[in-house]
Amino acid sequence: MSDIIIAFILGIVEGLAEFLPISSTGHLILVGHLLGFEGERAKTFEIVIQLGAILAIAILYHKRLVSLCNIKPLLRKEKKFNAFHVFLGVFPAVVAGLLLHDVIKTYLFQPYTVVIGLVAGAILMIFAEVKKQEATSYSLDDLTYRQALTIGLFQCLAVYPGFSRAGSTISGGLLAKVNYKTASEFSFLIALPVMVGATGLDLLKSWTYLSVDDIPMFAVGFITSFIVAMLAVVTFLKLLEKIGLKPFAYYRILLAILFTVFVLL
């Protein structure tokens, strides 16, 4: 299979899975394993196509991101979504990521560990659906600092490949009495700085694996993930309020079972 086709397939996988509660990292590792595209070059490629998904969110939420630069609501202690909400949502995962980065990259980026993450994340999502209470926050401006921190703590679970950043943060939001749409949007916004930081750190450590010959492949993957992520996010927000997290959780469990039976055993 040509590199361009592999790039196109993995770009679709990244764009679909990055902001859905199904784990993009897990899917990239599993699909890469099936395609025979593994190793340091594959890891570097995954970093680059994540940038496409990051750009999609930055464009979709550019107005909200620009508004975070206004510190007046924060200084006036207004009950309005501001940069401190994002800080509380990001800080725990940044600390966890920095402390565990090398361990995770060395030991946890394996198909069998991803299967564990898929199942564990699915259990959390089902638990959140069962235990959620009536929401008190129906928009980002309703979000309290405590709710933001709670979601940020749940984001720490996403450092484990296969767990899913969206799955863990949206689950945390539901348990903190935040509705689906608000939890999802906050999940997207706090994913940006974490992903940019993690991607930057990975690129610094992986730049030696980059080659001029890889530019066409990496470009196809980047563009594909960008376009697919744009479409996936808009569709997901509409779909989530109708069906909740359980269908995604069941899909994760089914995927883990199928991959274990047909590939790992």
From Swiss-Prot:
It comes from the Bacteria. The chain crosses the membrane at residues 4-24, 42-62, 84-104, 108-128, 184-204, 217-237, 245-265. Keywords: Antibiotic resistance, Cell membrane, Cell shape, Cell wall biogenesis/degradation, Hydrolase, Membrane, Peptidoglycan synthesis, Transmembrane, Transmembrane helix. It is an enzyme of class 3 (hydrolase). One of its GO terms (biological process) is cell wall organization. Catalyzes the dephosphorylation of undecaprenyl diphosphate (UPP). Confers resistance to bacitracin. Bacitracin is thought to be involved in the inhibition of peptidoglycan synthesis by sequestering undecaprenyl diphosphate, thereby reducing the pool of lipid carrier available. Belongs to the UppP family. This is Undecaprenyl-diphosphatase 1. The gene is uppP1.
